[in-house]
Amino acid sequence: MWASGGGPAADSNHNVYLSTGDGTFDVDKAGVDYGDSILKLSPGRLLLLDYFTPSNQAVLESQALDLGSGGVLLLPPQSTIPNNLLITAGKQGLIYLINRDNLGHYTMSQVVQQNGNIAGLFGTPTFWNNRLYFAGTTYTGGDSPRVFSFLGGRMSANPTSRAAGTYPYPGAVMVVSANGIKNGILWALQHGGTSSGNDVLRAYDALNLGRELYNSDQAGSRDLPGIVGMQFESIIVDNGKVYVPSTGAARLSVFGLLH
């Protein structure tokens, strides 16, 4: 498992959910291998409780289209049935919305919804205020961050807005800062976003990604975090500040309001 820097998810009963990368899948033939699968593990001993494997797993494995490049996101309880859902996507760019109380094994019976309206995902989706955020990409071409509405236990078929420009591989790890359900800001780190190769921290209106609020290339060299260097660092927002690790520049950049 790798999830491009994302960690396992856990529900209120302490069950653990994670995705796996390319490899052998032979559970349907009494084997023990779970390549390109979502696993649900018990608390404590981490015993296998349930799993989901796409019906095209053999294609994913043969073409290096890891499901495990994307992390697993558990969604808040829904008023509709099924009310406990998870969402993920992998390199193929196919989003899976799944009933996490019955993952379905090697069938598509418990897939509540599929959506192919993103490029391949390297990272974990982001959720805020009935919205889902993705920043997909491929090894050879970029894509832009986009947001889908999420209502009635289903996501919209098409993005409600998307950011201008493209994010090259590996896309972006994104996080939302907000005052509850108000004043949402989506933060994203764009790799190699300047002509000099520096990475750029960008802030968008979380309700309309077409509205950029800030980017770290606006003030010359003052705000540039440098070349991050590693592929899958996660940015962190806490107490009014944004923290960006930069192994390439051997520093931790901290962004906040100037006083």
PLM segments and residue spans:
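Acidic/polar loop-and-plug regions of large Gram-negative outer-membrane beta-barrel proteins
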Residues: G6
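Extracytoplasmic/lumenal domain signature
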Residues: M1-W2, A10-Y17, D22-S69, L73-H259
